[in-house]
């Protein structure tokens, strides 16, 4: 059966029963139908005195077009922990419509390990991303309206972009204000995908409604003739924006196919944003369960680095264990094996490609000082010889491997890794950051480039040099760094899979995200508004006369 058929043939518990598993009272949930709910932000305050449960971060090797199944493994682990009698909860990001209709498809797991209702989650869900889009574009409208009625704040340059939760390359650069009306000034504008909007980052890093409003007010939207920043609070827009986000800030409660609770909230990409679910969801989950399973987007060089260097730095969170998801297909792909031959047994290909996995392990274990286990997401084409070869190679580096068969067996396919994680999460670790707050922007970028990306050096465009100088002059040089680059390689070139230490990271631009509290560094040719592939997933998605959706995977 397909993923969507498996999901449709599974009887879900009503959402109030899932809430009961977490000891959440009925008055603290707002139901969106039978199987979805918002939970009150007061739940964290009510449980604040409780000790935190264990935090397990799931990341992966560098992703490939084949898909590694990070979300699938995350769900399997949560279900597996429940199978061995542990109280577990998932905290995941919400899918964006861009990938759903683009190249990646849905983001709710697969096979017997999915979060549900999968069609709802993959599409509009509870409207959080639409609310962010509305708040973002309300701000854009208010900026242009302010300029239209006299420009009292003296906008000389507008840096705030409009957004849309779809992949649409035509909107990367547009000209607005072409109506010909005398008071409307035409200008070049840009669109980001909504999940790259600073408002998404702000929502995911806010501790509560008050903090959300304050962070929104601190967003820089433009500069005057003196090159001084203009903030949202000067436009008096943060109140209306917060009103639009008053429900979006509340975490969404759903379930796995095996009825494990899941908080699915926030959805920044890890290649062009910070790639983590909301702070509110993670902190709440830690009070409600013994084990919180969360994931960070793409490979450990992107999502995990940002989870650790940005989210943990800002919140004081610290993972008790880290899972690095790998597949034999992906290892062979990084070893240069062609996609057409990827399912054939190939020890030589594994030998060449396993270095990618080694680097991610080294980053998490030695650079960040955290305990690591590798989850091998098993496919039918994997051979015992290949599995044993990888297991032996990792054993030589004192790294444990667990074969996960969640897709085929559900939580039963993750009992081994669940037991191992219980033990691993009890061991002490020596968590540390890659850079210090006191480092300059360039020092932070260089430390990430050398330690995490294995680069030789960092090269800057003239524009990037000037932008860094201006950011530090304004007093924001101590903020964390969020590098936006390709997910397919340690480098900024998606085709450079070998990534020997003789290449440079090329920085073309730097953007201050003062509301979110970090500096975005644009490396290589990464775009904050993706485009659709030649054959988008949208072509296969349909609905029949009975309202049954097909084609979401």
Question: Where do the PLM segments sit?
Answer:
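Flexible phosphate-sensing "switch/lid" loops adjacent to ATP/NTP-binding sites
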Residues: 1-553
């Amino acid at each position: 059966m397909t993923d969507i058929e498996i999901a449709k043939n599974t009887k879900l518990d009503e959402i109030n029963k899932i809430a009961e598993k977490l000891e959440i009272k009925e008055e603290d949930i707002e139901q969106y139908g039978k199987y979805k709910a918002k939970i009150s932000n007061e739940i964290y305050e009510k449980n604040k005195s409780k000790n935190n449960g264990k935090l397990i971060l799931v990341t992966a090797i560098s992703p490939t077009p084949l898909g590694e199944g990070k979300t699938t493994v995350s769900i399997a682990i949560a279900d597996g922990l429940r199978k061995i009698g542990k109280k577990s909860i998932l905290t995941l990001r919400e899918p964006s419509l861009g990938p759903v209709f683009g190249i990646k498809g849905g983001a709710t797991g697969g096979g017997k390990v999915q979060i549900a209702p999968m069609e709802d989650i993959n599409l509009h869900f509870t409207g959080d991303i639409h609310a962010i889009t509305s708040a973002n574009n309300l701000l854009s409208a208010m900026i242009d309206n302010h300029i239209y009625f006299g420009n009292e704040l003296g906008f000389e340059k507008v840096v705030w972009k409009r957004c849309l939760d779809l992949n649409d390359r035509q909107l990367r650069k547009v000209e607005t204000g072409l109506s010909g009306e005398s008071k409307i000034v035409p200008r070049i504008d840009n669109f980001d995908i909504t999940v790259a909007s600073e408002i998404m980052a702000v929502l995911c890093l806010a501790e509560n409604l008050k903090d959300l409003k304050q962070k929104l007010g601190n967003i820089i939207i433009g500069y005057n003739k003196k090159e001084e920043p203009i903030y949202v609070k000067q436009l008096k827009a943060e109140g209306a924006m917060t009103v639009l986000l008053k429900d979006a800030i509340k975490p969404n409660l759903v379930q796995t196919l095996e009825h494990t609770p899941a908080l699915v909230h926030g959805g920044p990409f890890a290649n062009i944003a910070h790639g983590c679910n909301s702070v509110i969801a993670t902190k709440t989950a830690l009070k409600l369960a013994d084990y919180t399973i969360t994931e960070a987007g793409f490979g450990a060089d992107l999502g995990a680095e940002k989870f650790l260097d940005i989210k943990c730095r800002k919140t004081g969170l610290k993972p008790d264990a880290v899972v690095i998801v790998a597949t034999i297909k992906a290892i062979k792909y990084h070893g240069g094996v062609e996609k057409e031959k990827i399912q054939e047994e190939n020890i030589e290909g594994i030998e060449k490609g396993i270095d990618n996995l080694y680097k991610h392990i080294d980053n998490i274990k030695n650079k960040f000082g955290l305990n690591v286990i590798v989850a091998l997401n098993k496919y039918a084409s994997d051979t015992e010889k290949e599995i044993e070869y990888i297991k032996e190679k990792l054993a030589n580096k004192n790294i444990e491997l667990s074969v996960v068969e969640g897709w085929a067996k559900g939580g039963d396919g993750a009992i081994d890794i669940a037991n191992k994680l219980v033990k691993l999460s009890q061991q002490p670790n020596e968590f540390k950051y890659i850079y210090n707050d006191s480092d300059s922007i360039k020092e932070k970028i260089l430390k990430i480039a050398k330690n995490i990306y294995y680069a030789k050096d960092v090269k800057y465009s003239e524009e990037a040099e000037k932008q860094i100088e201006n950011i530090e002059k304004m007093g924001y040089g101590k903020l964390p760094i969020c590098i936006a680059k390709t997910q397919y390689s340690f480098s900024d070139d998606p085709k450079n899979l070998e990534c020997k230490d003789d290449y440079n990271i090329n920085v073309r631009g730097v953007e201050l995200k003062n509301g979110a509290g970090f500096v975005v560094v644009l490396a290589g040719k990464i775009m904050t508004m993706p485009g659709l592939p030649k054959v988008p997933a949208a072509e296969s998605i349909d609905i029949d006369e009975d309202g049954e959706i097909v084609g979401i995977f």
